[in-house]
């Protein structure tokens, strides 16, 4: 019951118009078919009268045939017009839908613009950039500190390896920690022993100086 008093939308009106146009097109097609049938009958009647030599009857029937063919031609023109109207209706419907979509989009954009504060948005972006820079600086400082720690550890290990290598070259055996190593005086081989191993006095002296032994 409520649908009887419901206001028709544009889509409803266009749908009804298209329905009427389709009905009109079908009626024109039926009318043309009837005219074509009548046209054939007139042609047969004219031929029949011509065979009997009835010229007056042939003349009257020929005039009727001419009028009938003109009417058939008019049906094609009307049918073309109806098709054009149907196409225009579809185009109008599409345009109205696009206009409605644009209107909805405009309202949405307007609502978003009302909610958005350009100054506040700019401030938010600036704060984000500032905090991002702080985070990057903190991350860089942490990385630098870790690099220093690992570099120092690697330098210490490398230095210890060099010391062990030098001590081994001059004949001091390393077992356990450095604190348990024999003293430099006891552990150092004699000059003759060093020479027997092919190490010169200058080389021993240089290596001792490198170890801080005077």
Swiss-Prot record:
Among InterPro entries, the record links this protein to:
Snf7_fam (IPR005024)
Q: Where is this region: Disordered?
A: 178-200
Coiled-coil segments: 25-55
What does the entry give for GO biological process? Answer: endosome transport via multivesicular body sorting pathway; late endosome to vacuole transport; protein transport
- MIT-interacting motif: where is this motif? 202-212
One Pfam family hit: Snf7
Q: What keywords are assigned to this protein?
A: Coiled coil, Cytoplasm, Endosome, Membrane, Protein transport, Transport
Q: Is Coiled coil found in the keyword set?
A: yes
Q: What's the main place this protein lives?
A: cytoplasm
Gene Ontology CC terms:
cytosol; ESCRT III complex; late endosome membrane; multivesicular body
Entry-linked Gene3D superfamilies: 6.10.140.1230
Annotated compartments: Cytoplasm, Cytosol; Late endosome membrane
Give the membrane topology. Answer: Peripheral membrane protein
Function recorded in the entry:
Probable core component of the endosomal sorting required for transport complex III (ESCRT-III) which is involved in multivesicular bodies (MVBs) formation and sorting of endosomal cargo proteins into MVBs. MVBs contain intraluminal vesicles (ILVs) that are generated by invagination and scission from the limiting membrane of the endosome and mostly are delivered to lysosomes enabling degradation of membrane proteins, such as stimulated growth factor receptors, lysosomal enzymes and lipids.
Family assignment from sequence similarity: Belongs to the SNF7 family.
Q: How does it assemble?
A: Probable core component of the endosomal sorting required for transport complex III (ESCRT-III). ESCRT-III components are thought to multimerize to form a flat lattice on the perimeter membrane of the endosome.
Q: What is this protein called?
A: Charged multivesicular body protein 2b-B
Q: Which organism is it from?
A: Xenopus laevis (African clawed frog)
Annotated gene: chmp2b-b
């Amino acid at each position: 019951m409520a649908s009887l008093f419901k206001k028709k939308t544009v889509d409803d009106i266009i749908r009804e118009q298209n329905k009427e146009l389709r009905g009109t097109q079908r009626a024109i097609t039926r009318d043309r078919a009837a005219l074509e049938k009548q046209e054939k009958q007139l042609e047969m009647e004219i031929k029949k009268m011509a065979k009997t030599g009835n010229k007056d009857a042939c003349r009257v029937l020929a005039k009727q045939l001419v009028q009938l063919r003109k009417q058939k031609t008019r049906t094609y023109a009307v049918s073309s017009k109806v098709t054009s109207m149907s196409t225009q209706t579809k185009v109008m419907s599409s345009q109205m839908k696009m206009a409605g979509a644009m209107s909805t989009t405009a309202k949405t954009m307007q609502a978003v613009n009302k909610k958005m504060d350009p100054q506040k948005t700019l401030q938010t972006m600036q704060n984000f950039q500032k905090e991002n820079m702080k985070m990057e600086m903190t991350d860089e400082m942490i990385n630098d500190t870790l690099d220093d720690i690992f570099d120092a550890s690697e330098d210490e290990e490398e230095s210890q390896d060099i010391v062990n290598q030098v001590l081994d070259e001059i004949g001091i055996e390393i077992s356990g920690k450095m604190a348990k190593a024999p003293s430099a005086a006891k552990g150092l081989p004699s000059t003759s022993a060093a020479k027997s191993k092919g190490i010169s006095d200058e080389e021993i002296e240089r290596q001792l100086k490198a170890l801080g032994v005077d």
